[in-house]
């Protein structure tokens, strides 16, 4: 009887680990784990978010997607040695920190032109670095 309980307990633990592992694989943000592709995906989403008119009906949805991608991108690549030291990553991290800080402080307010220009410049630099592989 004790042996059966022990085996069932182990089986249940294994099933829970597999279930949690499988649900953790899909972040829901559209990031794949391919650094170059994920960087370009995040840039495209963020460009859409910062260029969206204030009265756009899908503004909140786009901002939520942008926030999710920012969090997922940083959490995936901050500690990875192969991506963390790249120039494109440090440029992206600077841009993402600026935008995340703005969203945290000001929420739904329009992004100032000065910040938009700086973000666009950093996105362009990151894209060029990705193309060169750095």
UniProtKB/Swiss-Prot annotation:
Family annotation (PROSITE patterns): PROKAR_LIPOPROTEIN (PS51257)
Keyword check for Membrane: yes
**What is its membrane topology?**
Lipid-anchor
Q: What happens when the gene is disrupted?
A: Not essential for photoautotrophic growth, under CaCl(2) limiting-conditions absolutely required. Impaired recovery after photoinhibition due to impaired assembly of the calcium-manganese-oxide cluster, especially at high light intensities. CP43 (psbC) is more susceptible to degradation, higher turnover of D1 (psbA). Calcium-manganese-oxide cluster assembly is improved in a double psbO-psb27 mutant. A double psbM-psb27 mutant is incapable of photoautotrophic growth, but does assemble the CP43-less assembly intermediate.
By its UniProt entry, which InterPro entries does this protein fall under? PSII_Psb27, PSII_Psb27_cyano_bac, PSII_Psb27_sf
Sorted UniProt keywords: Lipoprotein, Membrane, Palmitate, Photosynthesis, Photosystem II, Signal, Thylakoid
- Tell me the compartments it is located in: Cellular thylakoid membrane
Where it mainly occurs, coarsely classed, is membrane
Q: Name one Pfam family in it.
A: PSII_Pbs27
Q: Where is the lipid attached (N-palmitoyl cysteine)?
A: 25
UniProt function note:
Plays a role in the repair and/or biogenesis of the calcium-manganese-oxide cluster on the lumenal face of the thylakoid membrane. Photosystem II (PSII) complexes containing this protein are monomeric, are assembly intermediates lacking the calcium-manganese-oxide cluster and miss some of the lumenal subunits. Probably blocks binding of some of the small lumenal subunits.
Q: What family name appears in the similarity comment?
A: Belongs to the Psb27 family.
Q: What is this protein called?
A: Photosystem II lipoprotein Psb27
């Amino acid at each position: 009887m004790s042996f059966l309980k022990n085996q069932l307990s182990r089986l249940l633990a294994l099933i829970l680990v597999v279930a949690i592992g499988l649900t953790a694989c899909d972040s829901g943000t559209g990031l794949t784990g391919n650094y170059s592709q994920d960087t370009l995906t995040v840039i495209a989403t963020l460009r859409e978010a910062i260029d969206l008119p204030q009265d756009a009906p899908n503004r909140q949805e786009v901002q939520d997607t942008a926030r999710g991608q920012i969090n997922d991108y940083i959490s995936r690549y901050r500690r990875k040695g192969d991506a963390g030291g790249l120039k494109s990553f440090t440029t992206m991290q600077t841009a993402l920190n600026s935008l995340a800080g703005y969203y945290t402080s000001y929420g739904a307010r329009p992004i100032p032109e000065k910040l938009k220009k700086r973000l666009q410049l950093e996105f362009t630099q990151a894209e060029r670095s990705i193309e060169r592989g750095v």
